[in-house]
UniProtKB/Swiss-Prot annotation:
Taxonomic lineage from the root: Eukaryota, Metazoa, Chordata, Craniata, Vertebrata
Keyword list, A-Z: CBS domain, Cell membrane, Cell projection, Chloride, Chloride channel, Ion channel, Ion transport, Membrane, Phosphoprotein, Postsynaptic cell membrane, Repeat, Synapse, Transmembrane, Transmembrane helix, Transport, Voltage-gated channel
Keyword match Nucleotidyltransferase: no
Source organism of this protein record: Cavia porcellus (Guinea pig)
Activity regulation information from UniProt: Common gate kinetics are down-regulated by intracellular ATP. Inhibited by AK-42, a derivative of meclofenamate. Inhibited by Cd(2+). Inhibited by Zn(2+) and PKC activation. Inhibited at acidic pH. CCLN2:HEPACAM channel conductance is up-regulated upon hypo-osmolarity.
Principal location listed in the UniProt entry: membrane
Name this protein carries in UniProt: Chloride channel protein 2
Presence of keyword Aminoacyl-tRNA synthetase: no
Topological region Cytoplasmic: 1-89, 551-902
Family stated for the protein in its record: Belongs to the chloride channel (TC 2.A.49) family. ClC-2/CLCN2 subfamily.
All residue ranges annotated as the CBS domain in the record: 586-644, 794-854
Function according to Swiss-Prot or TrEMBL: Voltage-gated and osmosensitive chloride channel. Forms a homodimeric channel where each subunit has its own ion conduction pathway. Conducts double-barreled currents controlled by two types of gates, two fast glutamate gates that control each subunit independently and a slow common gate that opens and shuts off both subunits simultaneously. Displays inward rectification currents activated upon membrane hyperpolarization and extracellular hypotonicity. Contributes to chloride conductance involved in neuron excitability.
UniProt biased composition (Polar residues): 671-683, 706-719
Length: 902
């Protein structure tokens, strides 16, 4: 015995991961991950257990036939290289490197194509400057053709590619499945459509669409790498890669990896997993590096520099007395950002409310983008009105001139003289710098708000960024005009740098529109200087404080316009929201099905709601929540019960009963009683009559000591059957030893019935055996039979809340876990449901919506007397009562809750 015990101990040593005791903590000599992989490989290949002897060599059967072919060494070599790379480098590193490389190539190629398109427009305009009419036609026709092609190509190939893409990614990362948003055709439509849209010269952006493009690239790359196996076969892993891809999209767009990571976190996530932090930084940094290296390779740059490099003085970038001016820029940008979001949303709402115009434009889908492009191109025509708003400059050229550190209005020094091209753009003959900047800001403001509504792939970050830079430049030029000799400090004179004000304004307005602070970091990486870090941070924070109190962010506004599932943030300064509880906002008339219900009850529950999930309770009296069941499962159950196969089975059984000879009927009941006996047997076994035969519930047979003793236990039989059915739903199949002698005759009888079911006629003959009245009567009989949920996929632990949960905690739970609904229970009893719809209305202040029984927010306060132990004990006993009230039904129709759980 001792020897066997020692042998057993030695045999179990590998099972214990070869643990050895050390000085302090002890350690395992075998990694847990390696051990798990070896065990998984052994189980998959069916090899012997390592502690039961040395494993015998085994050759996979698929390699036996081609073991001596030429492809075998190549396959073996590729597998070994893949394993070496995965083991030495890691799958995450390989994926992130490929993602960064692909996105850098796409970004550089797109910028190259956009630059070619813009140069072609300038070449056409300058080549026809002798004829003003032809020059106007060329200036207007070129962007109209590109925008029309972009809109048509996107609508035909993938309408999901329209717009920014950040609102959709924010919804997807929250757990909502949006079809066709991460497919290959959407990727192609987004890339080509965005290139044409930006090449037209319209005030559109690139950053938002590139977040969507990077996410699609990550999704497609995950599917490709899953062909070789590995962790990317798991779909839940893709969410982490999408979070990193959002950072890559911003990083390769502006060559700003740090700001890209922070910006992607702010605009797409409410709660961010820190484990994805390094993935975003690594991939975004690699992508930005390749993006700038390609610019050097194409000889666009001499070395790797910032995208909009500035040359502000570093010894004294700004004076302390200039901080109030920077604060004014931040506050004004906050109001401007809120106004931009409001104007963008109002344009869409006005177009939707005009039914006649909307129907006409829906039939002529390309007319609206063509008209908008024609209007904007006409206003920006350089010889016309465009000369007063620098219409001949592209967005990149505009930013370069606005970030210039030289003063435009002060012409006292030689080094402050502007180049001729810039002087002609911002100093037209019949206007000055201030008038040009004011017209530029006003015109670009509403043009950008209108252009972002065009159904093409486009963003709004870059136009807003340019408008903010122009506003900051206007303030800077005004300060330079008011203090022409600069601000005197301790006998030293430091002239004002208007370019620094432009940097502050760009970051402030972009942060106000997007509700982000990371725009400050993006500005530092774009300019390559951090000299104005304090003014930029002050302006961005003030702009966010003002904008967040007035309007949602641009992306949240688009989410509301598109009616995507979302959960708004709890606004600051609204203390009454923290006093609302779940019982004040929950829907009390919850659609549910009982464990002992009939198929008629299932049909009624399906007619009452269109929700995706239905609550499963023990009974209508107890309302004990057992789980949740999908609507598709209920539809399948009901369809199988009333299917044509069951009707044919019923006809077969009736014909067999009629055609049986009298000699075979000796000692057997009549056909009518035989059919009635089969139906009663199925009811007592709680098994739906389907085409196939199900095993009876074995625990139900073991509970009673004898069949004769069940006659006087009617009251306790229902309670026992509920527990038996509950165990059969959430437990696996019973062990073989649970089979008793009492179930053998029934199983034998079922086997006999199965053997005699022989088809005697074809389907057409069987269908003609029953009249419509008989079919209707048969369906009514089937609807009265009890339901067996044994074959349904039931969630035994749906998410639950208690009625005293606060709104703040509920919002945190919904945001953190990504759930779309939660059942409200009190000591296990279902009393209500809370979905995103109710939670959203409670946060936005419209909690008195139709169909939702809502108590006032202050009604949730309890006096000190009601919090005593006696009162709570009384409430607990009242909840356990068999006839306690579960809440009043809603005043609205049952269809009011149709959109819950969506």
């Amino acid at each position: 015995m001792a020897a066997s015990a020692a042998a057993a101990g030695e045999g179990m040593e590998p099972r214990a991961l070869q643990y050895e005791q050390t000085l302090m903590y002890g350690r395992y000599t075998q990694e847990l991950g390696a051990f798990a992989k070896e065990e998984a490989a052994r189980i998959r290949l069916g090899g012997p257990e390592p502690w039961k002897g040395p494993p015998s060599p085994r050759v996979p059967p698929e390699l036996l036939e081609y073991g001596q072919s030429r492809c075998a060494p190549c396959c073996i070599c590729s597998v070994r290289c893949h394993k070496f790379l995965v083991s030495r480098v890691g799958e995450d590193w390989i994926f992130l490197v490929l993602l960064g490389l692909l996105m850098a190539l796409v970004s550089w190629a797109m910028d190259y194509a956009i630059a070619v398109c813009l140069q072609a427009q300038q070449w056409m305009s300058q080549g026809l400057n002798t004829n003003i009419l032809l020059q106007y036609l060329a200036w207007v026709t070129y962007p109209v053709v590109l925008i029309t092609f972009s809109a048509g190509f996107t609508q035909i190939l993938a309408p999901q590619a329209v717009g920014s893409g950040i609102p959709e990614m924010k919804t997807i990362l929250r757990g909502v499945v949006l079809k066709e948003y991460l497919t290959l055709k959407t990727f192609v439509a987004k890339v080509i459509g965005l290139t044409c849209a930006l090449g037209s010269g319209m005030p559109l952006g690139k950053e938002g669409p590139f977040v969507h493009i990077a996410s699609m690239c990550a999704s497609l790359l995950s599917k490709f790498l899953s062909l070789f196996g590995g962790i990317y076969e798991n779909e839940s892993r893709n969410t982490e890669m999408l979070a990193a891809a959002c950072a890559v999209g911003v990083g390769c767009c502006f060559a700003a990896p740090i700001g890209g990571v922070l910006f992607s976190i702010e605009v797409t996530s409410t709660f961010f997993a820190v484990r994805n932090y390094w993935r975003g930084f690594f991939s975004a940094t690699f992508s930005a590096f390749i993006f700038r290296v390609l610019a050097v390779w194409n000889r666009d740059e001499e070395t790797i520099t910032a995208l909009f490099k500035t040359r502000f003085r570093l010894d004294f970038p700004f004076d302390l007395q200039e901080l109030p001016a920077f604060a004014v820029i931040g506050i004004a940008s906050g109001f401007g950002g809120a106004l931009f979001v409001y104007l963008n949303r109002k344009i869409v709402q006005v177009m939707r409310k005009q039914k006649t115009i909307n129907r006409f434009l829906m039939r002529k889908r390309l007319l609206f983008p063509a008209l908008v492009t024609l209007l904007i191109s006409t206003l920006t025509f350089p010889p016309g009105f465009g000369q007063f708003m620098a219409g001949q400059l592209s967005q990149k050229e505009t930013l370069v001139t606005l970030f210039d550190n030289r003063t435009w209005v002060h012409q006292g020094l030689v080094e402050e003289q502007e180049p001729p091209s810039t002087s002609q753009a911002w100093n037209p003959p019949r206007a000055n710098v201030f008038l040009t900047l004011v017209i530029f800001i006003l015109m670009k403001f509403w043009m950008s708000a209108l252009a972002t509504t065009i159904p093409v792939p486009c963003g709004a970050f870059m136009p807003v960024f340019v408008i903010g830079a122009a506003f900051g430049r206007l303030v800077g030029e005004s300060m330079a005009a008011w203090f022409p000799d600069g601000i005197h400090t301790d006998g030293s004179t430091y002239r004002i740098v208007p370019g620094g004000y432009a940097v502050v304004g760009a970051a402030a307005l972009a942060g106000a529109v997007t509700h982000t602070v990371s725009t400050a970091v993006i500005v530092f990486e774009l300019t390559g200087q951090i000299a104005h870090i304090l003014p930029v941070m002050i302006a961005v924070i003030l702009a966010n404080a003002v904008a967040q109190s007035l309007q949602p962010s641009l992306y949240d506004s688009i989410i509301r316009i598109k009616k995507l599932p979302y959960l708004p943030e709890l606004g600051w300064g609204r203390h009454q929201q923290y006093r609302v509880r779940v019982e004040d906002i929950m829907v009390r008339d919850v659609p549910y099905v009982a464990l002992n219900c009939t198929f008629r009850d299932l049909r009624l529950a399906l007619h009452r709601t269109k929700g995706r999930m239905l609550a499963l309770v023990e009974s209508s009296e107890s309302m004990i929540l057992l789980g949740s069941i999908e609507r598709s499962q209920v539809v399948t159950l009901l369809g199988a019960q009333l299917s044509a196969a069951r009707r044919r089975q019923h006809i077969q059984e009736r014909r067999k009963a009629q055609m049986s000879p009298p000699s075979d009927q000796d000692g057997l009941p009549s056909p009518e009683s035989s059919v009635h006996f089969q139906v009663n047997t199925e009811d007592s076994a709680f098994i739906p009559a389907r085409g196939e035969t199900h095993k009876p519930l074995k625990p139900a047979l073991k509970r009673g000591p004898s069949n004769a003793s069940k006659a006087g236990e009617t009251s306790t039989g229902s309670m026992e059957s509920a527990g038996i059915a509950l165990r059969s739903l959430f437990c696996g199949s019973p062990p073989p030893e649970a089979t008793s002698d009492l179930e053998k005759p029934e199983s034998c009888e079922r086997r006999k019935l199965k053997r005699v079911r022989i088809s005697l006629a074809n389907d057409a003959d069987l269908e003609g055996e029953m009249s419509p009245e008989e079919i209707l009567e048969w369906e009514e009989q089937q609807l009265n039979e009890p339901v067996n949920f044994s074959d349904c996929k039931i969630d035994p632990a749906p998410f639950q809340l208690v009625e005293r949960t606060s709104l703040h905690k509920t919002h945190t739970i919904f945001s953190l876990l990504g759930v779309d609904h939660a059942y409200v229970t009190s000591i296990g009893r279902l009393i209500g449901i809370v979905t995103l719809k109710e939670l959203r209305k409670a946060i936005e202040g419209s909690v008195t919506a139709q169909g939702v029984k809502v108590r006032p927010p202050l009604a949730s306060f309890r006096d000190s007397a009601t919090s005593s132990s006696d009162t709570e004990t009384t409430e607990v006993h009242a909840l356990w009562g068999p006839h306690s009230c579960h809440g009043l039904p809603r005043d609205g129709s049952p269809s009011d809750s149709d959109d819950k759980c969506q």
